[in-house]
Amino acid sequence: MARAASKPKKEISMEEALWKSADKLRGSVEPAEDKHVVLSLFFLKFASDKFEAQRKAISEKYGEKFVDNVAFYTKDNVFFLPEISRWSFIMENAKQDDIALKIDTALYTIEKANPALKGALPDNYYSRLHIDTAKLASLLDEIDKINTGDKENDIIGRVYEYFLSKFALAEGKGKGEFYTPKCIVNLIAEMIEPYDGILYDPCCGSGGMFVQSMKFVEAHHGNKKKVSIYGQEYTNTTYKLCKMNLAIRGISANLGEMAANTFTNDQHKDLKADYIMANPPFNQKEWRGDNELTDDPRWDGYEVPPTSNANYGWILNIVSKLSQNGVAGFLLANGALSDDGTELKIRRQLIENNLVEAIIILPRNLFYTTDISVTLWILNKNKKARVVEENSEVKRFRNREREILFMDLRQMGSPYEKKYIELTEEDRAKVTSVYHAWQQEGYEETYQNVPEFCYSASFDEVAEKGFTLVPSRYIEFVNRDENIDFDTKMKMLQSELRDLLVAEEKSKADLLTVFKELGYEIEL
């Protein structure tokens, strides 16, 4: 009997092969540790390959006697690697029982030899994890196959980006905060256009905002050297991820002296940024003590943000860092659009100060960390009419001081990775073209309000609606089901649920009393 033809094996990409190899670490290390194990090895391989290429070039141009001269490496932004830090040494010892110690030693000596990497690399990390030697050797073999010299295809950047997204996806809801999906970062960059000046991210995670901004500048033939990067990150391991991510791509940045809390230990107190991009933690509770930061200069002119939620703390931190013509694009949970109390007072002041330029509701399931819908806020310190030359292009901005653009992108997006979606290049182009047309002179011909998509609201309209920034309060919806006042509906449900819970507690207390009076006390 003839044998059935075997199915051809599905070819997998280099990234997928690496992911499979990294996946074998499961069981050897905690899930949250995977990314640090793998990405640090990527960095080691990348740094070593660049070093070897530079070493060869020095030898050919100046002779062997200069190959160990550190200055010949640093002048070209290449890290100098002592022999025990080189990838060739690691691979020679990959099957040895003490390979974890050798990797730790390699990373330590690289950081010691290169002040620019201070605080970037793991310290005594691999030895502490007690990773199975065979699994670690297998991972090293896969990483060894990467051709980091393929500049045209940005192999190492591609791999690093792929792994950051996969790790965020794997960690899922409640974790993965170190990573903002690329399509969202691209949207922010395309809207605020960070061509020239200081770019700041107060909660920079693994540095995705910086990486995509530099790609944006490059794609538009701008000069990356005209952009200075400043950032801050609270989590030490993520701070290291960011430093490695930027180093791999040759992006220099000031991330402060250490990983630190942006609110209580601001690493850039006097900074004024031309562009701010951020994805702060959503609805962060107890971010300051009751009597802490009450007279912080970042709140000048505004109410002190409440301790119960950091959303408006992040907003005011961003406002305080904007330069005279600064623009910010950042993400917040939708609740910040309509919060009452202190938040309402701050929001009203922001609107009255002509800082809010655009509010954009994003589709659900864009993020790996939450399934809630999220808002992109655009703040602009100067909404007056002016002429600006950006990247050799003259733009004539009209006065938008008493206007806010509202957009709803919930009908956009394409399926991506399991249950998630992403904004395609076409989606983003549609959004940014509408936004930029609305900003500029001649908008009467190039911009129009579109039901279920966008609406330009006047200050008076916003004031009339109690300074809520919920887009559905302004954008016209053709479908009646879509025209539900979400904010009012949710507050009504909130009130009903509160009444039900109070009634439930009373019923439970009454029931316990009855049983006790019958002599059958119930102890909970």
Predicted regions and their residues:
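Extended hydrophobic-aromatic, low-complexity segments
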Residues: 285-289, 329-330, 339-343, 359, ...
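Accessory, often C-terminal, charged low-complexity segments
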Residues: 282-304, 311, 344, 349-352, ...
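Conserved Class I SAM-dependent methyltransferase catalytic core
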Residues: 17, 24, 33-46, 239, ...
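Non-catalytic, mostly N-terminal accessory regions of nucleic-acid modification and defense proteins
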Residues: 1-195, 254-267, 361-364, 382, ...
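Short, contiguous acidic/charged loop-to-helix segments that flank catalytic cores in large enzymes
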Residues: 28, 287-309, 334-342, 363-369, ...
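Short, surface-exposed amphipathic charged segments that create phosphate/polyanion-binding patches used
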Residues: 272-274, 372-379, 420-426
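Conserved S-adenosyl-L-methionine
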Residues: 174-278, 283-293, 298-302, 333-334, ...
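Hydrophobic alpha-helical scaffolding
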Residues: 129, 149, 203, 231-235, ...
